[in-house]
Amino acid sequence: MTEFTNRLQKVASNPKAFKNTGRGIERETLRFTLDAALSSKPHPAGVGSALTHKYITTDFAESLLEFITPVSHDVKTVLKQLEDVHHYTVSHMGEEKLWPLSMPCFVSKDDDITLAQYGKSNVGQLKTTYREGLKRRYGSVMQVISGVHFNFSFSNEFWDELLGEQTEKDRQDSVSDAYFGLIRNYYRFGWLIPYFFGASPALCGSFIQGRETTMNFESLGKTLYLPYATSLRLSDLGYTNDAQSDLKISLNSIDEYIEGLNKAIRTPSEEFAKIGLKEGDKHIQLNANVLQIENELYAPIRPKRVAKSGEKPSEALERSGIEYIEVRSLDVNPFSPIGVDEDQVRFLDLFLTWSVLTDSAPMDDSEMACWKDNWNKIVELGRKPGLELQIGCQGERLTQKAWAERVFDDLFTIAKKMDAVNGDDAYQQTHQRLSAMIENPELTISGRLLAETKKAGGIGIIGCKLAIQHRQAHLDHKYSFYTKDELDAEVERSVLAQKEIEASDTMPFSEYLDDYFNYLK
């Protein structure tokens, strides 16, 4: 019996180990107008305060909505929650629509994009100033690329069965170690996510206007595409940060990770210092370090813990270890009105469970570089027949198809165990549908989207068509988890909460900033 099989049998012995898995979804999407332009209107007043609303907020731009679900222990529930908040929001947006693709279209200039506004409180100004810094550092167009983030945690029962009886401190350390093992395996094998679910094989030519690229694009009118690409969002064209490439933050232990993160937020950047901190009285970045704050760290997966008020993410991790992980490699699924579907959630359940139960040796920088090379191949060439990937750095190679099949043998074993607990075959059905995509890459989301794009005559055309369909689906939707009254009450609560925060501020913003970054001194 392999170690993987042994560990799987342990956790599967307790039905609650899988039943109580925690999941949450964050979905980003741009508001745009009837004539296919980015919305210049403020955040819809009818959905409350973007600063304090639990489920409906904004990301980088005022027009970049973000929908957030609470933690749920049921796959269908988390999707129902997302459907309900989409319905509520679209009902308050007039004729505007939600852009159904990760890559923005019809946006070519930073000036087209208004930064997200959060009111006059110090914390609201801090959030907008942080975004001003991102704009000055990387440009606004990069920042309005949309994605879906999947938050995931194993149950206490899962850890009880896997780790046995332990003191509270030992359990905290063991759980953090196990999550870092998962994260390292995610870097090794997570290219499966863009292979199946990458949804940006093409983009509007306006997106790369004035930018240099070595990619050998083919064109279709104003659309640029790579014939075998899966996720240009995850490529060098997407949101990347050259200044971060030298950070080398270790994923081998929580202490090393926190140490690396602390170093990054304290390391001055010559390049960013040239931007300056203020223009007149206006703050234009929070500081001139490599990272203004920890959230600026670009990563396809992050270890997380819910922070207490005033606590930095790394301080929360240091206090009590890893609570959950945030998967950040999902493109928006253009074929789903909510940007993600049930098969994607179930695959991530299977894959993340496999990643934590499979051996995961420590990883050095050179090994990480080899795995990143595989990701780059998949995002640019993922559907190419016979594409070979590296197995580590020893020169051994395997086709993406053969490698995916190896992993899928193990995933099927997990699917059967999960289905046995739930009394259905939902995970095996997902496994079967994705197995067909291994055999035929054109069944993947990127394969289907590129075919539709060619048929329609351009990515902008297909984006507008899907947006109209999805808007109607949202308007036709009937509440299935929340009620309208509950969401109305959350709007009122959020507006009141913002007013209370603004009324309680006592110090000028410059003083507040000095105090906030006192830990850097």
Curated annotation (Swiss-Prot):
Domain of life (superkingdom): Bacteria
Gene Ontology CC terms, in alphabetical order: cytosol
InterPro entries: Gln_synth/guanido_kin_cat_dom (IPR014746), Glu_cys_ligase (IPR007370), Glut_cys_ligase (IPR006334)
Pathway field: Sulfur metabolism; glutathione biosynthesis; glutathione from L-cysteine and L-glutamate: step 1/2
Any single biological process term in GO: glutathione biosynthetic process
GO molecular function term, any single one: metal ion binding
Keyword annotations: ATP-binding, Glutathione biosynthesis, Ligase, Nucleotide-binding
Signal peptide per UniProt: none
EC number: 6.3.2.2
Catalyses which reaction(s): L-cysteine + L-glutamate + ATP = gamma-L-glutamyl-L-cysteine + ADP + phosphate + H(+)
Any Pfam family: Glu_cys_ligase
Top enzyme category: ligase
NCBIfam families: glu_cys_ligase (TIGR01434)
Family, similarity comment: Belongs to the glutamate--cysteine ligase type 1 family. Type 1 subfamily.
Protein name listed in UniProt: Glutamate--cysteine ligase
